[in-house]
């Protein structure tokens, strides 16, 4: 893909994200600058938003929760996340190419 926020390192996918916690539903929103914006329902308290983000991404990419690693931004809305060997690309990413 020609989107700046998607990079591959071997079989792993690296994503630069901006997170919107306390949303009404979990979803990919779109691009915000060079970051992918994701809305999740969990509040940004006691790591709940990070745990929920990992659960959401693991379902979207069809990988185990342990295959989602937040490399940077544990205490920030701006994150760098590694998806180890994603089994499936979410439908949302197809719309980024259009």
UniProtKB/Swiss-Prot annotation:
InterPro entries hit by this protein: DUF167, YggU-like_sf
Ranges in coiled-coil conformation: none
Domain of life: Bacteria
GO-annotated cellular components: cytoplasm
PANTHER family the record matches: UPF0235 PROTEIN C15ORF40
NCBIfam families from the UniProt entry: DUF167 family protein, PRK05090.1
Family: Belongs to the UPF0235 family.
Name used for this protein in its record: UPF0235 protein Ping_3043
Organismal lineage: Bacteria, Pseudomonadati, Pseudomonadota, Gammaproteobacteria, Alteromonadales
